[in-house]
Amino acid sequence: MIKKFSNMDYNQKRERCGQYIEALEEERRKIHVFQRELPLCLDLVTQAIEACKRELPEMTTENMYGQPECSEQTTGECGPVLEQFLTIKDSSTSNEEEDEEFDDEHGNHDPDNDSEDKNTKSDWLKSVQLWNQPDHPLLPKEERLQQETMTRDESMRKDPMVNGGEGRKREAEKDGGGGRKQRRCWSSQLHRRFLNALQHLGGPHVATPKQIREFMKVDGLTNDEVKSHLQKYRLHTRRPRQTVPNNGNSQTQHFVVVGGLWVPQSDYSTGKTTGGATTSSTTTTTGIYGTMAAPPPPQWPSHSNYRPSIIVDEGSGSHSEGVVVRCSSPAMSSSTRNHYVKNN
């Protein structure tokens, strides 16, 4: 009967040890993926597997010779070691805390005993803390980032808005400049206030953007916006006006072409007079290009300076019965230069 019970205990212990080995091998396969991050854990698991495998042949030999110490050895080394290795860290720490509290209450806290207990622990049990690290080692960093974002949002909510415009500017800066600032739309009312400020400050070429902004007193209006609008206004006033108001009717300014250049009609009408005669030009109006100057009439020479040369050719021979008069005046056509005068 005793041998039968010993065989049953041996089989159960061997089966249990085999289950421990399988569980440890499965854990080693899981850790092998992270062997660079967890080299010590992998080493500990392999050492435990090798220790269990060494225990199996010893158990068989001891069982053959009928030594009962094998059960004590297995339960003393293989079983508790593996159980302690696979247990969760929280349970072990909780037990230690309970023991410490019990010692503190009863005043049995002995530093010598504590040092002895620490020395009796094996090295791999001391380093088992690496195995029970949290699954998310970066979790504290993530929590810290979340706390920073929450505090930043709270500070943004608590930040008061001063004069409206500065608050909007502060919000735009906090957004990180991802979106461009919306351009200001100058309404007619805002432009009238701008013109009123220019009138009081001495005109667009005297007033500065800062003075204009302070005079207008508009929330959210910046110096850059006033400066941009002032530059556009100066360019607009510098351009020549196309329409001149005349009793409520707009009259288009006329231009004439003189020598390939566009000249206003007012400047062209006050031209110089040459040779005592005033040059006048008649203009013809077109619907698209305005007025254009007609070519000036040819200037005729005065009678005092003009002396036409007349050449008289008398006919010779029996066939010529008249006199040919030739005029060399450039104003006469070729058909009227030669006149035949018959002899009476």
UniProtKB/Swiss-Prot annotation:
- Phenotype reported upon loss of the gene: No visible phenotype under normal growth conditions.
Positions with biased composition (Basic and acidic residues): 105-124, 138-178
A GO CC annotation recorded here is: nucleus
Q: Which UniProt keywords apply?
A: DNA-binding, Nucleus, Transcription, Transcription regulation
Which residue stretches does the UniProt record annotate as biased composition, category Low complexity? 269-291
**Stretch list, region Disordered:** 88-184, 269-322
HTH myb-type domain: which residues?
A: 178-238
Mind listing where the DNA-binding region sits, in residue ranges?
209-234
* Broad class of where this protein is predominantly found: nucleus
Compartments where found:
Nucleus
List the GO biological process terms: cellular response to hypoxia; cellular response to nitrogen compound; cellular response to phosphate starvation; negative regulation of abscisic acid-activated signaling pathway; primary root development; regulation of DNA-templated transcription; regulation of response to nutrient levels
Q: Where is the composition biased (Acidic residues)?
A: 95-104
Question: What triggers production of this protein?
Answer: Induced by nitrate. Down-regulated under nitrate deprivation conditions.
InterPro entries associated with the record = Homeodomain-like_sf, HRS1-like, Myb_dom, Myb_dom_plants, SANT/Myb
Q: Matching PROSITE patterns, A to Z?
A: HTH_MYB
The answer, when asked if DNA-binding is one of the entry's keywords, is yes
* Disulphide bond pairs: none
**Which Gene Ontology molecular-function terms are recorded?**
DNA binding; DNA-binding transcription factor activity; DNA-binding transcription repressor activity
Please describe the organ and tissue distribution of this protein's expression: Expressed in the root hair region and root hair cells.
> What does this gene product do?
Transcription factor involved in nitrate and phosphate signaling in roots. Integrates nitrate and phosphate starvation responses and adaptation of root architecture depending on nutrient availabilities. Acts downstream of the nitrate sensor and transporter NPF6.3/NRT1.1. Represses primary root development in response to phosphate deficiency conditions, only when nitrate is present. Involved in the modulation of primary root and root hair growth in phosphate-deprived environment.
Q: Any other noteworthy remark?
A: Plants over-expressing display increased susceptibility in primary root shortening under low phosphate conditions.
Name listed for the protein in its UniProt record: Transcription factor HRS1
What organism is the protein native to? Arabidopsis thaliana (Mouse-ear cress)
